[in-house]
Curated annotation (Swiss-Prot):
Localisation per UniProt entry: Cytoplasm, Cytoskeleton; Cell projection, Lamellipodium; Cleavage furrow; Midbody
Catalytic activity: O-phospho-L-tyrosyl-[protein] + H2O = L-tyrosyl-[protein] + phosphate; O-phospho-L-seryl-[protein] + H2O = L-seryl-[protein] + phosphate; O-phospho-L-threonyl-[protein] + H2O = L-threonyl-[protein] + phosphate
EC number(s) given by UniProt: 3.1.3.16, 3.1.3.48
Protein's job: Protein phosphatase which regulates actin filament dynamics. Dephosphorylates and activates the actin binding/depolymerizing factor cofilin, which subsequently binds to actin filaments and stimulates their disassembly. Inhibitory phosphorylation of cofilin is mediated by LIMK1, which may also be dephosphorylated and inactivated by this protein.
Protein name (record): Protein phosphatase Slingshot homolog 1
Low complexity biased stretches: 13-25, 731-742, 925-943
Keyword Membrane: no
Disordered: region residues: 1-28, 456-499, 544-603, 693-787, 825-899, 923-955, 989-1049
Keywords annotated in UniProt: Acetylation, Actin-binding, Cell projection, Cytoplasm, Cytoskeleton, Hydrolase, Phosphoprotein, Protein phosphatase
DEK-C domain sequence ranges: 249-304
Gene: SSH1
Catalytic residues (positions): C393
In-chain residues carrying the UniProt-annotated modification Phosphoserine: S37, S57, S515, S576, S897, S978
Mutagenesis / variant outcome for changing W458A: Impairs stimulation of phosphatase activity by actin but does not affect basal activity
């Protein structure tokens, strides 16, 4: 389509009927001059020139000095026709018609003038040009438009106009031209009826002037008159189209659908209605000659739909170029803003409307998406100003419709499908091209991504998970937070390798996946990537699970699972863990939520290995890492810090989602606070494994599924472990390699401080399961050192951290008492003490059975079982099951340790067997103590938040209850203390009176001093058990800090 706007007037007016002015008198020389110039406001397309409604200005300069090159000969012809008119008359529309002569050019011209009553009067002129290049024209027909004028489509690509007994048929050269002619004629007939221009009346007398000017050749006049009899110049349909009988309704529906499709796909400027009907017949494979009237009516209806602007929203119209050129319609609809989404159409009324142009063509390669943002703001500008905006292109089908769909998607947050259906419902001819549809789909993704930034899925889901049922399964995406580089944790490469069931955990830096045979589903596989903190916490959750759940292979955490589970539920929508590891998963998931480290997740496996060697890097990369000032003191839970610089117990129990380093590692019993309140990261894991395994041997029947739900205990070194997980032979990690156990006897008896630092700081994962298993199984004869060391730990941790942990420790006890758990556990444990140990039943599936296969027969030493009595004795009572859960969870914790696990393996193996035995036994009672004191109900924890001072009132009473229940109140499993502080241990009188005699105390002090001295000796961290003596290439930063640490100790 060629749009030509000829020297548009800057002062357009809305009055369509005021085109002629009374001051213009015929014959006036000035007016004659004005009429010599062509109108400045004609809108031209191929085959039609539409007068843009001007105000008081006459049709201006009649001479077109620089005609538009792409408008064909229409501008020149229009200029000649205007010069043919009287000065007071104006052309409203000129439409080119088909001609029987190839070289002849014919126009139907609608001319209007002011009548006797200053009303608009219209006539039709038939103008002939002898050739396209002709500079002159003649009039061959004059037809007055009286009030009885009727217009009909002839079904052959034209329309008939009948009035006062005369009928003429006009066949415009294009559908677009015909549609513009029908519009103008319709309005002209309406004016004639309104003013009652009856035939033969005084109106339209001025038409006699043009009747007197008829001077065309007779052949031309005959063509104008003979057209009433002319059916069509189109030949009949080919014979191959055989008439098929069809049902009327079905055919009409099919015609409507096909016709609409054809008209939207055709360039209506270059096709006639005959051609459209031909195409329709071809597509339908039938002759539609009988239905041509129906087809024409439908075509007219579709043209009307295409031409009429569609009100999409209260402030937004979607239309075509014709709507943009109809000043009266624009002003009547309240449009003040026009968004022109075309390159070929100019702005018609730049002085009257606010325009914004998107200069693009309707092509699939056009990048329309880049303009949608500015279009959105322009449309909203109209909305803010309480006005309306017209968005138009050529037909209002593709470009402008796509822009409106994009606007709806952004403005209302709709998906593409909804926005498209809505706009198509409002404007049925809407059909964006394939390229625009692809861009709309891309735009939908952009908007979705923008919304996701504010979506709760990209934040910690504290609020939503509070309302989530505990046993309501949630997909992995429900709780996987985004890693710092934007990658969901489930998509990290080394996580995918870990998804194989039954394999040891390959994940580095305190993370691993609980991938066992009982966790085969994608939910469990993907969702169980967690941060293992202290086995004590796991034991807490296990303790709170009822016995019935313990026997099920797929147990789910119960409502009263306790403090840890409550916090987990507040952080995660994580509801379908299997077995005992269900609670573990929740605790660990909470750790992961708190402790996602930017570097920890973003690093490659080689960088992860560096993290294993460098706890400072771990701390720096972890959101949960302690401040640098606290690193040295956090080695063993800050044993000697009476008031650590952590904020509060409430802050620790309810860590912020941001995971500030200080807040996320505060000293309290929060399951998510690993560093201070919980068990020592090193000792409990050393001890938990043998305890758990001995316990499991004596209570296999009650816990048939606890083993399989936990990863295998023996893991290859960090590097090989990653390889194993991805390889087919990863199952080898399930069995303890000889190279893993043997170096434990040969390595020097030194545990580097860096390992301890790493353990207490970040790993919180059981470090040295395998060595402890190996070593613990042999020395079970000497029970005295065990009690010594246990007292040592208990008393040491009691004294210096009284203000820090007792408050938190007793806080939970108060809540336990509210829940009635302390009394129940006390009774059950007292009864447990009196129950003799059963012989070990047959081994069960899972890591525990594999583990005990590696434990020498000494592990069934009755003395050892007796020492573990309260924990390992089977019982049918619910609390017995819960008490058994503690060692099992300890076992799970130690089994699922991350790569740092191996470094401690090597150095832990350097302990004397007696020492290992004693520390293995140390946490048994304190483990139950931890479980009891920290298994407060989920509901009761809310009453504690922000009120840490309440727990001091009943400290002594609670401690007494624990001792009577056979539990020590020692802190190893509760407070994440570190062996590094053993040299400065002191005793609390309560613990001495509870479990110690003078000789025990003395021996334990000696043992502590010796162990503390060798623990202080820094040493490079080996990369795997086989290379125990190989120092790490880069010393851990904690080693560099050893002087300050030693001074503090």
């Amino acid at each position: 389509m060629a749009l030509v706007t000829l020297q548009r007037s800057p002062t357009p007016s809305a009055a369509s009927s005021s085109a002629s002015n009374s001051e213009l008198e015929a014959g006036s020389e000035e007016d004659r001059k004005l009429n010599l110039s062509l109108s400045e406001s004609f809108f031209m397309v191929k085959g039609a020139a539409l007068f843009l409604q001007q105000g008081s200005s006459p049709q201006g300069q009649r001479s077109l000095q620089h005609p538009h090159k792409h408008a064909g000969d229409l501008p020149q012809h229009l200029q000649v026709m205007i010069n043919l008119l009287r000065c007071e008359d104006r052309i409203k529309l000129a439409v080119r018609l088909e001609s029987a002569w190839a070289d002849r050019v014919r126009y139907m011209v609608v001319v209007y003038s002011s009548g006797r009553q200053d009303t608009e009067e219209n006539i039709l002129l038939g103008v002939d040009f002898s050739s396209k290049e002709s500079k002159s024209c003649t009039i061959g027909m004059v037809l007055r438009l009286w009030s009885d004028t009727k217009i009909h489509l002839d079904g052959d690509g034209g329309f008939s106009v009948s009035t006062a007994g005369r009928m003429h048929i006009f066949k415009p050269v294009s559908v677009q031209a015909m549609w513009s002619a029908l519009q103008v004629l319709h309005k002209a007939c309406e004016v004639a009826r309104r003013h009652n221009y009856f035939p033969g009346g005084v109106a339209l007398i001025w038409a006699t002037y043009y009747e007197s000017c008829i001077s065309s050749e007779q052949s031309c006049i005959n063509e104008w008159n003979a057209m009433q009899d002319l059916e069509s110049t189109r030949p009949d349909s080919p014979a191959l189209f055989v008439d098929k009988p069809t049902e009327g309704e079905r055919t009409e529906r099919l015609i409507k659908a096909k016709l609409r499709s054809i008209m939207m796909s055709q360039d209506l400027e270059n096709v006639t209605s005959k051609e459209i009907r031909n195409e329709l017949e071809k597509q339908m494979n039938c002759n539609l000659k009988e239905l041509k009237e129906f087809i024409d009516n439908e075509m007219l209806l579709i043209l009307g739909q295409m031409d009429k602007p569609s009100l999409i929203f209260d402030h937004l119209y979607l239309g075509s170029e014709w709507n943009a050129s109809n000043l009266e319609e624009l002003q009547g609809s309240g449009v003040d803003y026009i968004l022109n989404v075309t390159r070929e159409i100019d702005n018609f009324f730049p002085g009257l409307f606010a325009y914004h142009n998107i200069r693009v063509y309707d092509e699939e390669t056009t990048d329309l998406l880049a303009h949608w943002n500015e279009a959105y703001h322009f449309i909203n500008k109209a909305k803010r100003n309480h006005s309306k905006c017209l968005v138009h292109c050529k037909m209002g089908v593709s470009r402008s419709a796509s822009t409106v769909i994009a606007y709806a998607m952004k403005e209302f947050g709709w998906p593409l499908e909804k926005a498209y259906n809505y706009v198509k419902q409002k404007r049925s001819i809407t059909r964006p091209n394939a390229g625009f549809m692809r861009q709309l789909s891309e735009y939908e993704g952009i908007l979705d991504a923008s919304k996701q930034r504010h979506n709760k899925l990209w934040r910690q889901q504290t609020d939503s998970s509070l309302q989530q049922p505990v046993d309501d399964p949630a997909g992995p995406g429900d709780f996987l937070p985004e890693t710092p580089d934007g990658t969901p944790e489930s998509q990290l490469p080394f996580l995918d390798d870990a998804a194989q069931p039954g394999l040891g955990p390959p994940l580095p830096c305190c993370f691993r996946r609980l991938s066992d045979p009982l966790l085969p589903s994608p939910e469990d596989e993907t969702g169980s990537l967690v941060h293992l903190e202290d086995p004590e916490r796991e034991a807490l959750l296990e303790e709170a699970a009822p016995p019935a759940e313990v026997h099920r292979p797929a147990r789910q955490p119960q409502q009263g699972s306790g403090l840890c589970e409550k916090d987990v539920k507040k952080k995660l929508e994580f509801g379908s863990p299997k077995g005992r590891s269900g609670s573990l998963l929740q605790v660990e998931e909470t750790e992961r939520e708190e402790g996602l480290g930017a570097g920890r997740w973003g690093q490659l496996p080689t960088q992860l290995d560096q993290n294993l060697l460098n706890s400072e890097n771990l701390n720096n990369n972890s959101k949960r890492s302690c401040p640098n000032g606290m690193e040295d003191d956090a080695i063993f839970g800050i044993l000697n810090k009476v008031k650590p610089s952590y904020k509060s117990c409430a802050d620790c129990m309810y860590p912020t989602a941001s995971g500030a380093p200080e807040a996320s590692r505060e000293r309290c019993e929060d399951p998510n606070a690993p560093a201070i309140c919980t068990q020592p990261a090193f000792l409990p894991h050393i001890t938990s494994s043998p305890v758990a395994h001995l316990a499991s041997r004596s209570r296999v029947p009650e816990k048939p599924a606890s083993g399989p739900t936990e990863p295998p205990p023996f893991l290859p070194p960090a590097g090989s472990r990653r390889a194993d997980t991805s390889g087919p032979g990863a199952g080898a990690a399930l069995e303890p390699p000889a190279s893993l156990l043997e170096p434990s006897r040969e390595t020097p008896k030194v545990l580097p401080k860096s390992l301890l630092l790493k353990n207490s700081h970040c790993d919180k994962n059981p470090p040295s399961t395998e060595v402890v298993i190996k070593e613990e199984s042999s020395p079970k004869k000497d029970m005295k050192p065990a009690k010594d060391l246990r007292l040592l730990f208990s008393n040491e941790s009691e004294k210096p951290t009284t203000n820090s942990y007792l408050m938190q420790h007793q806080e939970s006890i108060i809540q336990l008492q509210k829940a009635g758990l302390v009394r129940k556990h006390t009774k059950e444990l007292e009864r447990l003490k009196s129950v003799p140990a059963d012989p070990a039943p047959p081994s069960r599936d899972g890591p525990a059975s594999r583990l005990e296969a590696s434990i020498p027969e000494e592990s069934q030493d009755p003395a050892a079982l007796h020492e573990l009595g309260p924990l390992v004795m089977p019982s049918q009572a619910g609390s017995d099951e819960k008490s058994e859960a503690a060692p099992a969870s300890l076992e799970g914790g130690s089994l699922k340790s991350p790569p740092p696990f191996f470094y401690r393996l090597d150095h832990t193996s350097s302990f004397s067997k007696d020492f290992l035995k004693t520390i293995c036994y140390t946490p048994t009672s304190s483990s139950m103590s931890s479980n009891l004191t920290r298994s407060s109900s989920s509901d009761s924890i809310h009453s504690v938040r922000g009120k840490p001072g309440l727990v001091k009132q009943r400290t002594q009473e609670i401690e007494t209850r624990l001792r009577l229940a056979g539990l020590t109140v020692s802190s190893p499993l509760k407070r994440s203390h570190s062996l590094a502080k053993l040299g400065s241990l002191t005793f609390s009188t309560e613990d001495l009176s509870s479990e110690a005699d003078p000789s025990t105390v003395a021996d334990s002090q000696d043992t502590t001093l010796s162990e503390s001295s060798f623990l202080h000796e820094p040493q490079g961290t080996p990369r795997d058990p086989a290379a125990t003596s190989k120092p790490s290439g880069k010393p851990a930063p904690e080693n560099l800090k050893s002087p300050s640490w030693m001074s503090k100790s």
